[in-house]
Amino acid sequence: MKEGRKLPVGAVKSLEKEKWLGQPFPEFKVNDTQERVWTRADIIGRPMVLNFWYTGCGPCRREMPDLNRWMERFPNVTYLATTFDSAAQIQRIVEETPFRFIQIADELFFFNLFKVTGMPVTVLVDKKGMIRYIEEGTGAAKLRYMGDLLARLAAERRKRSALDITSKTERLCS
């Protein structure tokens, strides 16, 4: 973590789920470990999973294989992982436990925004950029529920795309 940066003070309960559910994902600008700049515009048009984790978090590491399986199952979703750890720290961990999400290292923007103090936390965002689900902790029930919701979000994307094509065709033929 960069010197002078601190996580917000408070218990895990400070996560403001109710404040964010159903709201647009806010504007942001962050760099991933490959130096790509990400903004809100990059997440519009396809669902997104944002996972909060850190290298010393056992539950975070235990859920990584399940999160990786989501990537295989739903390839048309954007997968971001954010941590306050450095890129070098992330690299050491993902060599032991692969975690294929796009990594945003040494960054507290999302932590402060959502008031995250306990991890893991996962946020699901729909293709319009609306926050549909936020959950802290891990476990089989959470991962199963979130996987089902992600399946619906991914199907919603395909279904609406097909409807958009149909309505455009109908307008052209009218």
Model feature map: region roles:
Residues 4-40:
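N-terminal "domain-start" segment that seeds a small globular fold
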Residues 7-19, 124-174:
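Thiol-/selenol-based redox modules, centered on thioredoxin-like
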Residues 52-69:
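Conserved redox-active cysteine motifs that mediate thiol-disulfide chemistry
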